Amino acid sequence: MNLNATILGQALSFILFVWFCMKYIWPPIIFAIETRQKNIEESLISLKKAEEELIIIQKKMNQIIQDSKEKASFIINEANKKKSIILEDAKSIALEESKKIFLRNQLEIDLKVMQVRKNLHKEIVDLSILIAEKIIKDNIQKDQYKYSIKKLIVSLSKDKKLI
């Protein structure tokens, strides 16, 4: 065997093998690699877009949360103001009502005091008349000072009628 022919045969076989691989095997492998690269690039682009959208959505969400907190704070402040106003109104109404009740009770007390004084004065006058009658009956004879006694009784009776 000739060494040159063997090397030439092997070289020719190798060239045919490389040509066959480049013609039929290599293109599908390259196509699969390129497709995979495109998919990876598209995935990376989609990932970047998704991250940007996520950042935008988080900013919007934070803004919405902040707005909600401000609205809640405003509503709470308004409710506290209304509560204060209602409490002040209730206090003033209660104070006015207590003043009315106090004045009404004071008038009732004054009326009762006046009635008691009037009754007491009447009883004092009645007792005075009774005492005077007893003293007069005991100390004065019937005929003596009759005119003075009648005058005293009439004047006391008039005082009693006035009361």
Curated annotation (Swiss-Prot):
TM stretches of this protein:
13-33
Record bears the keyword Signal: no
Query: What InterPro entries does the annotation carry?
Result: ATP_synth_B-like_membr_sf (IPR028987), ATP_synth_b/b'su_bac/chlpt (IPR002146), ATP_synth_F0_bsu_bac (IPR005864), ATP_synthase_B_chain (IPR050059)
- Provide the primary localization: membrane
UniProt entry tagged with the keyword Ribosomal protein:
no
List UniProt keywords, sorted A-Z.
Answer: ATP synthesis, Cell membrane, CF(0), Hydrogen ion transport, Ion transport, Membrane, Transmembrane, Transmembrane helix, Transport
Source taxon at top rank: Bacteria
Report the locations given in the UniProt record.
Cell membrane
One GO MF annotation is:
proton-transporting ATPase activity, rotational mechanism
GO (cellular component) term, any one: proton-transporting ATP synthase complex
Membrane topology per the entry is: Single-pass membrane protein
Purpose of the protein: F(1)F(0) ATP synthase produces ATP from ADP in the presence of a proton or sodium gradient. F-type ATPases consist of two structural domains, F(1) containing the extramembraneous catalytic core and F(0) containing the membrane proton channel, linked together by a central stalk and a peripheral stalk. During catalysis, ATP synthesis in the catalytic domain of F(1) is coupled via a rotary mechanism of the central stalk subunits to proton translocation.
Family assignment from sequence similarity: Belongs to the ATPase B chain family.
- Quaternary organization: F-type ATPases have 2 components, F(1) - the catalytic core - and F(0) - the membrane proton channel. F(1) has five subunits: alpha(3), beta(3), gamma(1), delta(1), epsilon(1). F(0) has three main subunits: a(1), b(2) and c(10-14). The alpha and beta chains form an alternating ring which encloses part of the gamma chain. F(1) is attached to F(0) by a central stalk formed by the gamma and epsilon chains, while a peripheral stalk is formed by the delta and b chains.
Could you tell me what this protein is called? ATP synthase subunit b
What species is this protein from?
Buchnera aphidicola subsp. Schizaphis graminum (strain Sg)
Source taxonomy:
Bacteria, Pseudomonadati, Pseudomonadota, Gammaproteobacteria, Enterobacterales
